[in-house]
Amino acid sequence: LEIIPSEDCLPELVEFMKEFAARRLGKGVVIAKDTPNFIANRIGTYAYMQVLKKMPEYGFAVNQIDRITGQVIGRPRSATFRTLDMVGLDTFVYVANNAGQAVEDEKENADFQIPAWLQKMVAKGQLGDKNGQGFYKRVKTEKGSSSLIWDPVAEEYVPPGQEALP
């Protein structure tokens, strides 16, 4: 739980809320400054940005990344790219830009720079679940429907392969 005390907030109230959240709600508490984005968003955005930048470099496919960043490491089944599709690619870009602007260090700021291929996706209207095309896209087939995945190098949707993980 993130608690953001204002200048006018009584220290006793902050302490009470910390204690209440920890004991009654079972929550870990972080005292934060009043800055844009939640702490978890800033940390999560950084982690997602690292994946987005490394994926094409190492030749991973969207579905491969989701297989290794989901339940196998204790994260939700939606993993990385299904989560980004749920959030909305335009929303993620907004949050990442916002987080990057709050960072003063040049190298850290570079970590929040949106990859060109993701900027193109958003510019083309690929927003994720909002409009049915993000990193995943459902298509109708003769046998019903199937999913395609976005290939950032080819800049097109492709069938997901069942490649072995390295």
Model-predicted segments: where are they?
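N-terminal glycine-rich phosphate-binding loop for ADP-containing cofactors
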Residues: 1-166
